Amino acid sequence: MIDLKIESSWREVLLDEFQKPYFNSLKEFLVGEKQKYTLYPHSSNIFAAFESTPFESVKVVILGQDPYHGVNQAHGLAFSVNDGVPPPPSLCNIFKELHDDIGCEIPKSGNLMSWAKEGVFLLNTVLSVRASEANSHKNRGWEVFTDTVIRLLSEKKENLVFILWGAPAGAKASLIDEKKHLILKAPHPSPLSSYRGFFGSKPFSKTDEYLISKGLKPVEWCI
């Protein structure tokens, strides 16, 4: 059984999506996958980003790709890992930029739940993965679903900040109305690309400056 319950404010916004043929196919695919493979995150955490940041609470969107595929890493929030799990390299680089940008101490835990509670929606474009197989659930329907999520956030809200790291995330800018929202693009924080412009991109201070300029409360980024 795949547990796909979603927080009530999101359920209301996405109700039509859950009835569509592609989503039924995606559910069938996940049921079959679960019989044969270990999947991450646990099915009860697939929609953890939605549970942690209700629709009306979203102020910032940080877009990831697919979940971490190592044991105990993924828990449904993009880039975040469970307490007690060493932060992966991309997250270490995010924390380095956090320190260099706004002076936060480097967090000891890689759990970003406190950001989610501050209105930072930590969305992966694909919400499940096979253990040890990156991108194994690519092009199975999740992208259609998360594109709709991004588009609906853009349409129904205003003055959001969308933080898009890396080319795949950057391509999602076409779903966002830049007259209503701030889009911040930079290279991915992965060690392969972080020195090509991720470091020094100042996403945290730029986000807070924008929110303050719109009369909104800045994010408490320090963990």
From Swiss-Prot:
Q: What is this protein called in UniProt?
A: Uracil-DNA glycosylase
What catalytic activity does the UniProt entry give for this protein? Hydrolyzes single-stranded DNA or mismatched double-stranded DNA and polynucleotides, releasing free uracil
What Pfam families is this protein classified in?
UDG
Might you report a single GO cellular component term? cytoplasm
**An annotated Gene Ontology molecular function:** uracil DNA N-glycosylase activity
User: Any idea of its EC number?
Assistant: 3.2.2.27
Question: Which gene does this sequence derive from?
Answer: ung
Read off the CDD domains from this record.
Answer: UDG-F1-like
Q: Report the active site residues.
A: 66 (proton acceptor)
Q: Write down the species.
A: Sulfurimonas denitrificans (strain ATCC 33889 / DSM 1251)
According to its UniProt entry, the function of this protein is described as: Excises uracil residues from the DNA which can arise as a result of misincorporation of dUMP residues by DNA polymerase or due to deamination of cytosine.
Compartment annotation:
Cytoplasm
Which domain of life does this protein belong to?
Answer: Bacteria
Q: Which NCBIfam families match?
A: PRK05254.1-1, PRK05254.1-2, PRK05254.1-4, PRK05254.1-5, ung
| Keywords from the UniProt entry | Cytoplasm, DNA damage, DNA repair, Hydrolase
Q: InterPro entries this protein is in?
A: UDG_fam1, Ura-DNA_Glyclase_AS, Uracil-DNA_glycosylase-like, Uracil-DNA_glycosylase-like_sf
Q: Return the similarity comment.
A: Belongs to the uracil-DNA glycosylase (UDG) superfamily. UNG family.
BP GO annotations = base-excision repair, AP site formation via deaminated base removal
